[in-house]
């Protein structure tokens, strides 16, 4: 019996020693010095956001100064049964991260506001595994095909083009915002560029995020790349939402210069201020019959006017027998973006000048009569 009491006292002493060691470890972890490196997401103290279920007016910016973070570690000695049950519960309640947007393609007219709305499928902050996430929103412009001449013209107009390249871009790629959520569920974001151009908001309760692009111009034609990352900055899911900037043609005109009788007719159809390039289709009619246009030698049909979109010129050459009246030349223009279609047309009749015909009459070597027809 004495030996049993000794062994019991020894066992208790051992458990007390273990408890003291664990308590000391917990105390030391709770008092980390300021020079200890921690994960970059946890080194900020995000501004709290009220979860009222209403879209926020804005997401607060991250603090300008780095604040120290206190880390507390809970120590427990779980049994095998409790560990298995907790893992099963975590696996059953775990959500696969995803980004679901209301649409993948948004058409916005020039000078209007474009809006994107997405649902963030993430676990609540109580889940330690996914309590931290990062959301990066990057704008990528859509390139358009052009010959070298048009690329240079685009550069002069203020677009981003590479000399010698066959492509031009509205502008370079740009990180719009970087949003973080800390383990407590609070959000913070880096300041958005371009002043009030972009507006980013987060609904903490509904796990939704939105992007607004104000006063859209042709440089905003591209796609937003939304990447959801874990707390180690590893990408979990990526979504592309295209913003199609568009503008219907402002005017359509046909110019048909005068010609001499027997010379070919020439006409040019000018479609001004539309967007994007390639959204306009031109067809010709001669007295109601289809005629084939002639491209310029360098293949270019359009050019940019800074801040006003693109202008297209299509040229056609028609035969002239000199025996018929001048034809009615019509230009039919169809502008299309997505499900939106707009048509217009213009007509011109070229003026024909005839060569003068002169008759002379001679009698006894002298000019008697002359007239011109």
Curated annotation (Swiss-Prot):
Top-rank lineage group of the source organism: Viruses
Region (Disordered): 58-93
Alphabetic keyword roster: Glycoprotein, Host-virus interaction, Immunoglobulin domain, Signal
Residues modified by glycosylation: 91, 111, 203, 345
Ig-like domain sequence ranges: 249-347
Record's keyword annotation contains Cell inner membrane: no
Biased composition range(s): Polar residues: 59-68
Stretch forming the signal peptide: 1-25
Composition bias, Low complexity: 69-80
SUPFAM superfamilies named in the record: Immunoglobulin (SSF48726)
Family: Belongs to the herpesviridae glycoprotein C family.
Protein name (database record): Envelope glycoprotein C homolog
Organism: Meleagrid herpesvirus 1 (strain FC126) (MeHV-1)
Gene name as annotated: gC
């Amino acid at each position: 019996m004495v030996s049993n009491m000794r062994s019991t006292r020894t066992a208790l002493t051992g458990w007390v020693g273990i408890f003291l060691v664990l308590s000391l470890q917990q105390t030391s972890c709770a008092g980390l010095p300021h020079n200890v490196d921690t994960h970059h997401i946890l080194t900020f103290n995000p501004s709290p956001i009220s979860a009222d279920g209403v879209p926020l007016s804005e997401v607060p910016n991250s603090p300008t100064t780095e604040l120290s973070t206190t880390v507390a570690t809970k120590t427990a000695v779980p049994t095998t049964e409790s560990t298995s049950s907790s893992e099963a519960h975590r696996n059953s309640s775990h959500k696969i991260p995803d980004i679901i947007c209301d649409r993948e393609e948004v058409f916005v007219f020039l000078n209007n506001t474009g809006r994107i709305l997405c649902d963030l499928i993430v676990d609540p902050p109580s889940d330690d595994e996914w309590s931290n996430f990062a959301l990066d929103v990057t704008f990528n412009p859509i390139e358009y095909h052009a010959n070298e001449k048009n690329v240079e013209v685009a550069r002069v107009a203020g677009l981003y083009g590479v000399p010698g390249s066959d492509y031009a871009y509205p502008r370079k790629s740009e990180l719009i915002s970087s949003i973080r959520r800390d383990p407590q569920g609070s959000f913070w974001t880096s300041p958005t560029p371009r002043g009030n151009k972009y507006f980013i908001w987060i609904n903490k309760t509904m796990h939704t995020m939105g992007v607004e692009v104000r006063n859209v111009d042709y440089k905003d034609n591209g796609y937003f790349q939304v990447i959801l990352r874990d707390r180690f900055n590893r990408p979990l899911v990526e979504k592309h939402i295209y913003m199609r900037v568009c503008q219907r043609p402002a005017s359509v005109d046909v110019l048909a210069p005068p010609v001499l009788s027997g010379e070919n007719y020439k006409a040019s159809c000018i479609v001004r201020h539309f967007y994007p390039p390639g959204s306009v289709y031109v067809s010709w009619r001669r007295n109601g019959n289809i005629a084939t246009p002639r491209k310029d030698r360098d293949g270019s049909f359009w050019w940019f006017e800074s801040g006003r979109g693109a202008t297209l010129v299509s040229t056609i050459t028609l035969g002239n027998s000199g025996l018929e009246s001048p034809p009615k030349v019509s230009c039919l223009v169809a502008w299309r973006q997505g499900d939106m279609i707009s048509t217009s047309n213009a007509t011109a009749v070229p003026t024909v000048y005839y060569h003068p015909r002169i008759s002379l009459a001679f009698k006894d070597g002298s000019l008697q009569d002359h007239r011109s027809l």
